[in-house]
Amino acid sequence: MKSFLKMTLAVIAGLILTGILFFVIMLSVISGIAAAGNKPAEIAEKSVLVLKTGTAIPDRTNSNPLSMLDPFSLTFTPEAGLNDILKNLRKAASDEKISGILIENGLMPSGWATADELRIALKEFKQSGKFIYSYSDYVLMQESYFVSTAADAIWLNPTSMFDFKGLAAEVTFYKDALEKLGVEVQVIRHGKFKGAVEPYILDKLSDENRLQISKYVGSIWEYAVKAISESRGVSVERVMQLADSLSGYNAALLTGAGLIDGTIYRDQLEDSIRSAAGIEEGKKINFVSMTKYSKVPEKHSGGLAKSKIAVIYAEGSIVMGEGDETNIGGNSYASVLREVRRDTAIKAVVFRVNSRGGDAIASDMIWREVELTSKVKPVVVSMGNYAASGGYYISAAADKILASPMTVTGSIGVFGLIPNAQTLLDKKLGISSDVVKTNSHSDFPSIMRPLTAFEKEVLQSNVERTYSTFTGVVAAGRGMSQANVDSLGQGHVWSGTDAADAGLVDSFGGLNDAIKEAASLAKLETYRLVERPAAVDIYSRLLKEMSGEVREKIVSRELGEAARYYYDLKEIISSRGVQAVMPCYIDIY
């Protein structure tokens, strides 16, 4: 018995020591990678910069090493954000060591507005006289193709396909599933177009929601088709005809029509690159990733300039509290804006917003700080793929708002959502509860019972008051009457093109254009950029986020496409109170 206990304790001690050792090793490896990432890099002559499209490209490069870790293979796959990609394209244009760019097309969407910014930046790079080639090993997606129309040549692998068919917007509905589970979603809303709640109370699109989706998806596709037509020298009518006929499954037809330049194997692609770059036949090509090129120092970067422009990145859902790198915390972003406002060296602010919205109170907190900041120094909003509902709310007080024609914005409307899981818990799972109250509504709101008529009335009043505040904020920021904003509001979602026509956006442009606009408003000839929120200390971040980052990767890996449904249903449970969110999970593909 004694020997058994000794052996058991030894095994337990061994497991604990192994776990500690593994943690220390992982911490050392990750810290080493993070430290190495700060060292300047050098590249060889006649290098080719690689731009990977068809991947999830965040607005800002994630400085968290855990985001680069694949928990299954324990390998690191660093990826650059849009901010660094745009810097790299500008830098590469004048870098004598960069001969050209290869666009490697993948399968994941990064967002149409992001694609538009990349395409514009590539066209500017092209003015340097250097080559741009585009290649797809597998399936060329429409979004990647749109970016690739800035290239000198677009090639496909002979066995690959081009998924060219026009845009579709798909909405997933949970009403019947929730009813079967015994969950009632109680909704209080303002705005006939507020489609964010429809997946929980309907089993198909309302006429109003179908109308608005058709309009903004049609606007985005119209812009894309026009750009394709101009770049490839193919009429708009012919482009539409090719999309209608699913011609992407016949590469020869696409080549003949002029949408692509042909099909070649990778060795033939590399021969073409060698020829364009002046590299000897058979010699290895030095391909440079965006992540590596970000570490190459830029000449004349303005690093010594005293005046600064702060670029604040706000990406994800708007939530109460501090938030994290995947969302926008009301408290933390209010603090960032206060800090930027008080810093006298910062002469202007670019507020990059890429959000479908979120908590109404958190949105109002951020808006207030933007308004106060705009009274002290110029604030320019740069809208990404989305700046809708709460995303528009936090943008409204800026001096200027820039967006892509492909940005999805507007959705000026609010709603309240309270799940009632009484049937699920009581009838299906046998879980009941009892409550002792000091007042009539001490347990309000509760997922254990339905709302009373009075409680619904209180929530409706709160929603109406919040909507009035929202339209007032927009009216003040955009110089409109509140009645005019109401006519544009009601939860209506707009494309960037239509938002500009409606006066919700000042002009078209991406992040680079917003920075130039901010410099112009602040009358700055020389300046340097500082990015906010500031990077968190690596050790604090590792300890705080290790479990969360790995958990999210495991969920995404195991559920794949279905992971979005998991997060959507999870949000139902967490979303209490008044929300300002656009229709959720509308896939445009």
Predicted ranges, named:
Residues 40, 49-171, 301-424:
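Cleft-lining beta-strand/loop regions that shape enzyme active-site pockets
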Residues 42-45, 300-306, 427, 523, ...:
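Extracellular/periplasmic catalytic domains that process cell-envelope and extracellular macromolecules
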Residues 230-231, 261-305, 415, 471-477, ...:
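C-terminal long alpha-helix characteristic of the crotonase
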Residues 304-309, 313-345, 462, 533-589:
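Intrinsic disorder and flexible/low-complexity segments
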